[in-house]
Amino acid sequence: MSYTNGGFDPTTRAYAAIAAWWLIGAGAALTLWTARSPISRLALAAPILLALYTLWILLSMSWAPDGERAFQQFNEVSLYVAVLVLAIALARIVPASWLVGGIALAIAGIAVISFLSRVLPSTFSGSTQQSEILSALGVRLSFPLGYWNGLGIEVALAFPLLLSIMASRRSRIASALAALPLPVIAADMYLTSSRGAFAAAGVAIVAFLVLAANRWTALSATVAAAIAGVAAVYVIRPRHALVSGQMATPLGDHQGHVVALVVLVTGVVIALAWLGAAELGRRLPTPPSLVGWATAAVLVVATVAGIVASHPVRRFEEFKAPSHLTGSANFVEQHLLSSSGSGRWQLWSEAVSQFRAHPLNGEGAGSYDFWWLQHRPIPLFSQYAHSLYLEALGELGIVGLLLLAAALLVALAGAVRAAFLLRSPEVAGLAACAIGFFFAAGYDWVWQLAGIAVVGVGALGLALGALPSSRAAPWGRFDIARPALALVAVAAIVPQVVVLAAGLHLQNASVAAANGNLRREKSEALAAKAVEPWSSTAYLRLAQVDLDVGKLGPARSLLESAIRRSHDNWELWWYAAQIDVRRGDILAAKRELDEARKLDPNDVAGLLSQAGAP
C-alpha cells in the first residue's frame, strides 16, 4: 500500500481490508489459527475494544455532517481491526524472527526505492511528480508515499526491527544484512526534512533499548546505526543540488551518482564491521549491572542537560507560532533545526474547541475538516488535526477517545509484557516499532495513511500475540470463537465492498467526464448512488452532468440532495449559488453564498476576490 499513495485512497484500503478479513474468515473456517497455547486475555480484549471504537465511528454516521466521510473512516479502522486480529493469530503460529524479518525487509525496500528515486530519478517513472495528497515542496523527498513526513516516519519504524535482528544471535548473516539499509534509511529521513521522523525513531530506539533483554548488544547495534546515519548525512549535506531535488541538472545527476555509491559502500562497511563486532561481543563477558546503571544514568543526565540547554520555554513559544519557513536552497536543514510546529498548535487547539462544543459524542467521524475550515485562525489547509487522539476527541467525543485509548493501552501493555517475559529481541523490536508509530500518530496524520498504519498496528498485534498465557480461557484456542470470527469476517467485508464499488464507479465517472462521455459519466454516477445512497459525491457528479447539458433545474435539485448529505461542505453551497445565479434566482444565490461564507470564510473570500465581487 505504501507504493499506492501511502494507502490513502479509500479504494486501496478497501482492497486491503477485504483481503485481510477474507484471510481471517478462511483461517477460522479451516482451523488454520489453532495455536499450541491459549491466547492471553489482553490479546483477546484489545481487538474487541478496537472493534467497539470502530462501531462507535459507524454509529456517528447518524449525527455526522457527512455520512460518506464517516463511513469511509469506519472502513479505514475496520481494516486496522483486521490487521490487529490477523497479526495476533500469525504470532501464534509463525516464528517472531520470520515476521520481524519480513516487515523489516518490506520497509527497507520502500526506503531503497525512495532513496533511488532521488539519487537516480530515472529509475522510477513519476518519482519526481508532486504528491497527489498535497502540493508538495519539490525539495522534500516524498516518493512513493506522496507525503514527506509519512515517508520519513515509515522508514524510521524500521530501526527497532533492524536493531532487533542485529541484536539477535539466531543468524550471523542475517544480523549483518540487517545493518545494510541503515545509511539509506538515515539518508531518506534527512531528505524528507521530517522532524517527526527523527522523533519517532528516537522514541522507538529508546523503547527497544528498554525492552531488550541484552541491552549491551542492543546499545552496540544502536551505536552502529548512529555511525551509519551520521556518515550518510555527512555525505549528503553539502550536496545542495541533490538535497534540493535539482536532479535534472548535470550537477544534480553527478551528485546523485556519487551519493548512491558512497551510501552503498557505507552500508557494506557497517555490515561487515557489525559482523566482526558481533563475533567479538560473543566472546567478551557481559559488563556488571553497576556499569549498566551508570551508563543509563549518564545518558539520562546528558538528555536532561540537552533539553535544558535548548531553552525549552522559548522553543515551545516558537512551536506555537505559525511557520514562516519557505522553500530555499537550505530549506531541508533550516526546517530540521527549526522549532516551528507548522501550524500544529492551531490544529490541535481547534480539535479541543470542537470537543468543547460536542463533549460527549463529538461532531461525528470525518467532521474535523469542516470544523477547521469554519474556525481556522490561520490560512492553512488540512483535512486532519495531525493528532489521532485529539481528532478522535473532537470528532467522537470523550466516548470515542476512551474506547480508542482503552484499546491501545491494553494492546501496548500486552506487547511490553510479552517483550519482558519472553526476553526476545524480535518481540522487543515489534513492541518498540508499535510504540514509535503510536507516538508519531500523536503529532501527524499517519493513522490516515494505511500503508504506515498497518505497520504500526501489525507490529503491535504481533508483539501482543506472542504474549504467553497460563490460563486456558474458554475462548483461548478459538474453539468457541472460530465460528463467530468467521461470521464477523464476512460481515466486515460487506461495507468494504460498498466503499470499493462506489469508489470505482466514481473513478470511472471521472474518466468518462475527462473523455467527454456524458452518458457513461451519468450511468457510473447513478451506480455509485445506488451502491452508497448517503454519498454526496455521487449526487454532485450527477448534478455536474445535468449542468453540462444545461439542465439547471434538475442540477439544482440534485445539488440540494448532495447538501442534505453533507450540509457543512461549503463547496456544495458555492456550486448551488452559481447555479441559482444562472437561473436568475439572485435571492437564493445570496443565501447560499452567505452559507458558504459562514462555512469557510477564507476560501470563499478568495474566490469572491478573484471574481471581483464584494
Which sequence ranges carry the predicted segments?
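TM-adjacent membrane-interface loops and short helices in multi-pass inner/ER membrane proteins
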Residues: 147, 327-383, 389, 396-403
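Membrane helix-loop boundary segments at the extracytoplasmic
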Residues: 2-8, 391-396, 428-456
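Membrane-interfacial helix-loop-helix modules of multi-pass inner-membrane proteins that assemble, modify
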Residues: 61-63, 76, 108-153, 183-190, ...
